[in-house]
C-alpha cells in the first residue's frame, strides 16, 4: 500500500497551486494540444481529462509526454480497470464522480493519488474509513452547494473539497467563502461553441478571468 498521507499531501499541493481544475472532454483529437496550451496560457496548468470519449486516454498520454510541465489527471474513472488504464497512460492524479469500496481499495495500492467523488455523508464515511480526507463534491450544485459543504464541516472537520458540477463565475464567491473548499472544478472556461470553433484565444481569456476572480474572492 502506498502512503496515503503522502498522496493526500500531493492532492493538497495540486489544489493549492491549481486553484481551478478545468474539466475537459475531448471530442476531437486535433483539439488536445491547442486546448491545453490555451488553458495553460491563461494560467490553468492542472487539467482533468475526462474519459467520456474515445480520446480521453490518448489526451492523457499525449499531454503527459508532450506537455510535461502540465499536471494531467484523469476524470470520470468508474472502476479499477479504468483507473489502471489512466495510470498507464500517465495520469498524475485520478478523479471519480462517485466512490465504491472496490475502487477505493484499488486506489490505495496505486502510486497515483485519488480524489474520490462524494455527494452524501454516507459516501464520505465510506471513503473516510479507508483513510481518504480529500474529496470532489459532485455534482456540487444539485448536491447542496455551499450549504452542504458547510454542513459537512461539522461531523467531518478534517476533510477538504474540490466542488465540481454547476460551479461558475456567478457562484464562485459562494463556494470560496466556505473554509473547507480547497479548489474548484469547472467547465465554464470551455464553452462548447467556443471549443467547436477552435477559438483558443477566447479559452485563454476565460481561463485568465477565472483565476483573477478566484484570487479576488480568496483575498476577502
Curated annotation (Swiss-Prot):
Site keyed Plays a major role in determining the stereoselectivity: positions: 164
**One function term, GO molecular function aspect:** 2-dehydro-3-deoxy-phosphogluconate aldolase activity
Q: A Gene Ontology biological process annotation?
A: Entner-Doudoroff pathway through 6-phosphogluconate
- E.C. code: 4.1.2.14
Where along the chain is pyruvate bound?
52, 76, 136
Pfam families linked to this entry: Aldolase
Part of which pathway?
Carbohydrate acid metabolism; 2-dehydro-3-deoxy-D-gluconate degradation; D-glyceraldehyde 3-phosphate and pyruvate from 2-dehydro-3-deoxy-D-gluconate: step 2/2
Report which reactions are catalysed by this protein: 2-dehydro-3-deoxy-6-phospho-D-gluconate = D-glyceraldehyde 3-phosphate + pyruvate
Q: Where is the active site?
A: 48, 136
Quote the Gene3D superfamilies the UniProt record gives: Aldolase class I (3.20.20.70)
Query: Please, which domain of life does this record's source organism belong to?
Result: Bacteria
Keywords of the record: Carbohydrate metabolism, Lyase, Schiff base
Which PANTHER family does this one have? 2-DEHYDRO-3-DEOXY-6-PHOSPHOGALACTONATE ALDOLASE-RELATED (PTHR30246:SF1), 2-KETO-3-DEOXY-6-PHOSPHOGLUCONATE ALDOLASE (PTHR30246)
Similarity annotation: Belongs to the KHG/KDPG aldolase family.
**Subunit annotation:** Homotrimer.
Q: What function does this protein fulfil? A: Involved in the degradation of glucose via the Entner-Doudoroff pathway. Catalyzes the reversible, stereospecific retro-aldol cleavage of 2-keto-3-deoxy-6-phosphogluconate (KDPG) to pyruvate and D-glyceraldehyde-3-phosphate.
Name of the protein in its database record? 2-dehydro-3-deoxy-phosphogluconate aldolase
Q: Which organism is it from?
A: Pseudomonas aeruginosa (strain ATCC 15692 / DSM 22644 / CIP 104116 / JCM 14847 / LMG 12228 / 1C / PRS 101 / PAO1)
Amino acid at each position: 500500500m502506498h502512503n496515503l498521507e503522502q498522496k493526500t499531501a500531493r492532492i493538497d499541493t495540486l489544489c493549492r497551486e491549481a486553484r481551478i481544475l478545468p474539466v475537459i472532454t475531448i471530442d476531437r483529437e486535433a483539439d488536445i494540444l491547442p486546448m491545453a496550451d490555451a488553458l495553460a496560457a491563461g494560467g490553468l496548468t492542472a487539467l482533468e481529462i475526462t474519459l467520456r470519449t474515445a480520446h480521453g486516454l490518448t489526451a492523457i498520454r499525449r499531454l503527459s509526454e508532450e506537455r510535461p510541465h502540465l499536471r494531467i489527471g484523469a476524470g470520470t474513472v468508474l472502476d479499477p480497470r479504468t483507473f489502471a488504464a489512466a495510470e498507464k497512460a500517465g495520469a498524475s492524479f485520478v478523479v471519480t464522480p462517485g466512490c465504491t469500496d472496490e475502487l477505493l481499495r484499488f486506489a490505495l495500492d496505486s502510486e497515483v493519488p485519488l480524489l474520490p467523488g462524494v455527494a452524501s455523508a454516507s459516501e464520505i464515511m465510506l471513503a473516510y474509513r479507508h483513510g481518504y480526507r480529500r474529496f470532489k463534491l459532485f455534482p456540487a450544485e444539485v448536491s447542496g452547494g455551499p450549504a452542504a459543504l458547510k454542513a459537512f464541516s461539522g461531523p467531518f472537520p478534517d476533510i477538504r473539497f474540490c466542488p465540481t458540477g454547476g460551479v461558475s463565475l456567478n457562484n464562485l464567491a459562494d463556494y470560496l467563502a466556505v473554509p473547507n473548499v480547497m479548489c474548484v472544478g469547472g467547465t465554464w472556461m470551455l464553452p462548447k461553441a467556443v471549443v467547436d470553433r477552435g477559438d483558443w484565444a477566447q479559452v485563454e481569456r476565460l481561463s485568465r478571468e477565472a483565476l483573477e476572480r478566484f484570487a479576488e474572492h480568496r483575498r476577502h
